[in-house]
Design a protein with these regions (language model features):
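A conserved pocket-lining segment of Rossmann-fold NAD(P)-dependent short-chain dehydrogenase/reductase
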Residues: 125-128, 176-197, 201
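Active-site Tyr-X1-5-Lys
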Residues: 129-156
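N-terminal Rossmann-fold NAD(P) dinucleotide-binding loop
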Residues: 1-2
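Mid/C-terminal beta-alpha module of Rossmann-like enzyme folds, strongest
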Residues: 205-272, 289, 294, 304-317
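NAD(P)H-binding glycine-rich loop region in Rossmannoid oxidoreductase-like domains
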Residues: 24-30, 34-84, 92
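Conserved Rossmann-fold NAD(P)-dependent oxidoreductase catalytic core, especially the SDR/UDP-sugar
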Residues: 84-133
Length: 317
């Protein structure tokens, strides 16, 4: 969210409103030009204030509030925020005659066999994807697209791949990985990889979608496949550390994943490797971003620059 605001505030004409969960830190929004509203997307009545005084204005609602979840244990909050929260946002957007840019995920799109190219789809089904997070994102997209067809909603959908980069005050599992490698605390990595995209490139694509995104259309914002070993090597290069030599096969990592989850839970940290994250690292990550490049003028920066900027941001924090 904060990276989108950083992009939006480059245009002095933009009036920016940020919706923050009650009790959440606003450290990520410090010194940013936005008016903060507090509430909870799962409680529709708390959304009223942020939608006030929008008559006669061109309004874009960028819905990026979500619970990204990679743990094995079921968590009802994931469904409540990702699905019910999205339904509430959709209802308010329809009422206010605004345009919705819904931030989904590539995880909402079914995996293709044999490393076949994965492109945008129009029919979403939670039963066709694996993991609680993916299922909730698929259900939410289905609701958004149904509202476009049946309730006169104006919306487009963004599917980012694995988001990585600076200004992650929420300390996601990828930021946790960079931190541990940069600090020399990780002595082994796992085989496999994924498509990782710079959060600032995603922010650029999202802002472009406000004006250029077509109603009812989906756009994949991806980059390229990057092995975890390559990612770790880039981090070590930036920090001037020795590269990690031990690479564990996914099968062995899956055996110890439950222990990792308990260990990080005790430390109150985001787990690096879970059963679901390991499944993801061995899944097909061959995503096409051609549509976004053509329609949204989407671009990717070099991953080395992403890692360099992220490590520098961490060191300044």
């Amino acid at each position: 969210g904060n990276n989108i605001i950083r992009k939006l505030e480059q245009d002095a004409d933009n009036e920016i409103r940020a919706f923050v969960l009650n009790g959440d830190s606003i450290k990520s929004l410090k010194k940013l030009r936005c008016k903060i509203y507090y509430g909870d997307v799962t409680k529709k009545e708390t959304l009223s204030l942020i939608f006030e005084n929008t008559d006669g204005k061109e309004v874009f609602v960028i819905h990026c509030a979500a619970v990204v979840y990679i743990k094995s244990k079921y968590n009802p909050l994931v469904y409540n925020v990702n699905v019910n929260g999205t339904k509430n946002i959709v209802d308010k957007v329809i009422e206010s005659k605004a345009k919705l840019i819904y931030i989904s995920s590539v995880h909402a799109i079914p995996e293709q066999p044999n490393n076949e190219l994965i492109t945008e789809i129009t029919n979403f089904n939670p039963d066709n994807v694996k993991g609680l997070y993916a299922k909730t994102k698929a259900e939410a997209v289905k609701y958004v697209l149904d509202a476009v067809k049946n309730k006169n909603l104006n919306a487009c959908i963004i599917h980012p791949s694995g988001i990585i980069g600076p200004n992650d005050f929420g300390n996601s599992h990828l930021t946790q990985l960079i931190k541990e490698v940069a600090n020399g605390k990780l002595f082994a990595c796992v085989k496999g990889g994924y498509d990782f995209v710079d959060v600032r490139d995603v922010a650029d694509g999202v802002v472009s979608a406000c004006k250029n995104g077509i109603n009812g259309e989906c756009y994949i914002l991806s980059n390229r496949y990057i092995a975890i070993k390559e990612l770790c090597d880039l981090i070590c290069d930036v920090q001037g550390r020795k590269k990690i030599k031990m690479v564990l096969p996914i099968g062995i990592a899956k055996l110890v994943a439950p222990l990792f989850e308990v260990y990080y839970s005790l430390k109150k940290q985001t787990p690096l490797f879970t059963k679901y994250s390991l499944y993801t690292l061995s899944s097909n990550a061959n995503f096409s971003n051609e549509k976004a490049k053509e329609k949204l003028k989407f671009k990717n920066r070099n991953m080395k620059d992403t890692i360099k900027d992220t490590v520098e941001w961490m060191n300044k924090k």
